[in-house]
Amino acid sequence: DQALDICENLGETVGVAIDVYHVWWDPQLANAIARAGRMNRIFAHHICDWLVPTRDMLLDRGMMGDGVIDLPAIRKMVEDAGFFGPQEVEIFSAENWWKRPGDEVLAVIKQRVASVC
C-alpha cells in the first residue's frame, strides 16, 4: 500500500511490480493487489520461491515450486486485478541455480512455469 500511495502522488506513469519474494507473507496482499489493479498500476509480476530455511536473504531465492509461496493464488490475484503481462522469473541463487548450465536452468524454468505457476 505504501508503494501505491507513492504512485498516486507521482502520476499515472508510475506503477508497481508484484514481486512475490517481497510480498507473499503480507496478510493484506489481496487488498493491495486489487487496489493496484483498480488504479491500473501493476506494471510487472516477478516470480520465484521462498526457501525454508533461507541461507541468504538476497541470494537464495528458490525455483518456483521449491519453497512455500502459494504462486497460483498470487497469480490469480494479479490476473483478477487485470494484469495479464508476462511473469518475470527472478532466481537470485548464488549457491544453486547460478552454478548450473544455462540450458538446464531454462528447461527447469519452463517446466515449473507450466506446472507450478
Model-inferred region functions:
Residues 1-18, 22-117:
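Histidine-acidic metal/acid-base catalytic patches
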